Swiss-Prot record:
It comes from Neisseria meningitidis serogroup B (strain ATCC BAA-335 / MC58). Residues 1-142 form the RNase H type-1 domain. This is Ribonuclease HI. The keyword Nucleotide-binding does not apply. One of its GO terms (cellular component) is cytoplasm. The keyword Transcription regulation does not apply. It is found in: Cytoplasm. Monomer. The lineage of its organism: Bacteria, Pseudomonadati, Pseudomonadota, Betaproteobacteria, Neisseriales. InterPro entries: RNase_H, RNaseH-like_sf, RNaseH_domain, RNaseH_sf, RNaseHI. It is an enzyme of class 3 (hydrolase).
Length: 145
């Protein structure tokens, strides 16, 4: 597993809920690939999760993946909260159903196929790759707004 792939991901929503989009900038060495899409009625958090899911789904073989996201929701969910949710039957600490559990379950399964680490980047702060992911997410949302 010597291939390291960087996934720069972002989600966007025009209204929350409303038309939304997701974007992924994939980088492997000097190679880059852009992915984006959207939905007519969604939330910003669903689009943030979908961006990571779509990036991971596009990988053809097991590899080391560094996911760079501006979403504390996604990063904290995968690094801290998901273990408790799974133990509690997909309920939060306050016994409420986990929001977006369909996407969390899909993301959890995809992460298990790779060696994944998570990096948080400040959004809208001039981080070039995050800005590109944001542009892609907005392109995805524009298809539905």
């Amino acid at each position: 597993m010597n291939q390291t792939v960087y996934l720069y991901t972002d989600g966007a929503c025009k209204g929350n809920p409303g038309a939304g989009g997701w974007g992924v900038l994939m980088r492997y060495g000097s190679h880059e690939k852009e992915l984006f899409g959207g939905e007519a009625q969604t939330t910003n958090n669903r689009m943030e999760l979908t961006a990571v899911i779509e990036g991971l789904k596009s990988l053809k073989r097991r590899c080391t993946v560094i996911i760079c996201t501006d979403s504390q929701y996604v990063k904290n969910g995968m690094e801290n909260w998901i273990h408790g949710w799974k133990r509690n039957g997909w309920k939060t600490a306050s016994k409420q159903p986990v929001k977006n559990d369909d996407l969390w379950k899909e993301l959890d399964a995809l992460v298990g196929r790779h060696q994944v680490s998570w990096t948080w980047v400040k959004g809208h702060a001039g981080h070039a790759e995050n800005e590109r992911a944001d542009d892609l997410a907005n392109r995805g949302a524009a298809q539905f707004s």
